[in-house]
Amino acid sequence: LTEDVYEVDCNWKLAMDTFGETYHFSALHSETLNLQFHGNVQCYDTFGRNHRMLLCKRDIDGMRDKPESEWDITTATLPVYWLFPNVQLMPGAGILFLVRAYPDKERPGKHVSRVHFYVRSEILEDSEIKEIVKEVGKTFAEIIRDEDYLMSASQQRSAESGAIKYSIFGRNEPALHHYHNTYRKMLGMELLPLLETPDR
């Protein structure tokens, strides 16, 4: 239904990181995604080099009062699949978002993202619904561009300045650990070290 192409001032792996956790929703997406999702909870599974996260929608709150037979995963969650090395796939009820990040061959601090929004054909038969769904796809792509990637470009500038020697991923960021350890393993590098804390 829609396709957007963004040239972004951040490395493609940093772009993938933006899809790796949800606790930033209340700060970065306070007027957008935070209104639709609980940012402090998710389900996470790995499948070899790939992974799946289930982002918890606020609509799940209303399911508590329904029998389990009426629960619907696409009402309660948004599944997000990372397909190694550069694809984010987000299926919903009759829709699908596909985000692919491509490195810039000349400039490692830049990349191109292609954001596609697919919709089942029967949904598009109603012209009014088609326009609503089209707006949903456009809005989601703009959130990626204007919120996530804007922050990623800032992080890229910090990384290039040399002021920050390393980043620490928290225990609540399993997807980020998985992304980077998968990349490192494929490059023949040691896995990220785990920091020990006194109480563990």
Model segments located where?
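C-terminal catalytic domain of Rieske-type non-heme iron oxygenases
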Residues: 1-200
